[in-house]
Amino acid sequence: MKFFSNFFKNKNNLSSHNVINIFAPISGDIVEIESVPDEVFSNKIVGDGIAISPNSNILLAPINGTIGRIFETLHAFSIKSDDDIELFVHFGIDTVKLKGRGFKKISEENIAVKIGDPIIFIDLPFLKKLVKSTLTPVIISNIDKFKKITKNTGSVIAGKTVIFSVQK
């Protein structure tokens, strides 16, 4: 029954065979990173991962770890996991230009978080009217430290659905 055990893993980053799971930081639909309308993400300049077309209002911790930085404009944050993953979550494209409007910080930098802990509130209807795109890239910036990345597709629930996994 090893096949079915993969569907019922504990809610932590590390599963069997040194595979580390990354969970959805926001609910919505997975989009290929290459489809993000910003070359920094679509060309994988800052790392590899996926994007999510969001349909909810809170960005959650996608891994267990420590919040490294919450950007002053509240549109992005980074987390370093207990498994040495450096993860970057960036809400929308050109959201930095809003200077924090439409966002509210829930958590703080240098705080230990668990999968599903709230980090930033977003006013999705407000932001949809003002930004180029609400696609939310979720990127591993130190992807070169891992052997393999396996990306999932489909609809996701924040804090519950694995969006991709990496193998050490």
From Swiss-Prot:
The active site is at H90 (tele-phosphohistidine intermediate). It is found in: Cytoplasm. Keywords: Cytoplasm, Kinase, Metal-binding, Phosphoprotein, Phosphotransferase system, Sugar transport, Transferase, Transport, Zinc. The EIIA domain is phosphorylated by phospho-HPr on a histidyl residue. Then, it transfers the phosphoryl group to the EIIB domain. One of its GO terms (molecular function) is kinase activity. Coiled coil: none annotated. InterPro entries: Dup_hybrid_motif, PTS_EIIA_1_perm, PTS_EIIA_component. Residues 38-142 form the PTS EIIA type-1 domain. Pfam families: PTS_EIIA_1. One of its GO terms (cellular component) is cytoplasm. This is PTS system glucose-specific EIIA component. Its cofactor is Zn(2+). SUPFAM superfamilies: Duplicated hybrid motif. Its main location: cytoplasm. The phosphoenolpyruvate-dependent sugar phosphotransferase system (sugar PTS), a major carbohydrate active transport system, catalyzes the phosphorylation of incoming sugar substrates concomitantly with their translocation across the cell membrane. The enzyme II complex composed of PtsG and Crr is involved in glucose transport. Zn(2+) binds at H75, H90. The modification Phosphohistidine is found at H90. The record marks H75 as: Important for phospho-donor activity. It comes from the Bacteria. One of its GO terms (biological process) is phosphoenolpyruvate-dependent sugar phosphotransferase system.
